[in-house]
Amino acid sequence: MSKLTKSRKIRLAKATQQNRRVPAWVMIKTKRTVVSHPKRRNWRRSTLKV
């Protein structure tokens, strides 16, 4: 069992916050020209360099 340091925990939390979908109001405002954002990350497919 590995220990999580505070700095690593903060970086993981930041990565989780960045991994959100585009808000619905943005889709409405841009008339669905902006539907997804390119930096979206899947937990199985890609790894984090944390």
Curated annotation (Swiss-Prot):
GO terms for molecular function: structural constituent of ribosome. InterPro entries: Ribosomal_eL39, Ribosomal_eL39_CS, Ribosomal_eL39_dom_sf. Gene3D superfamilies: Ribosomal protein L39e. Keywords: Ribonucleoprotein, Ribosomal protein. Belongs to the eukaryotic ribosomal protein eL39 family. It holds the Pfam family Ribosomal_L39. GO terms for biological process: translation. The gene is rpl39e. It comes from the Archaea. PROSITE patterns: RIBOSOMAL_L39E. GO terms for cellular component: ribonucleoprotein complex; ribosome. This is Large ribosomal subunit protein eL39. Disulfide bonds: none annotated.
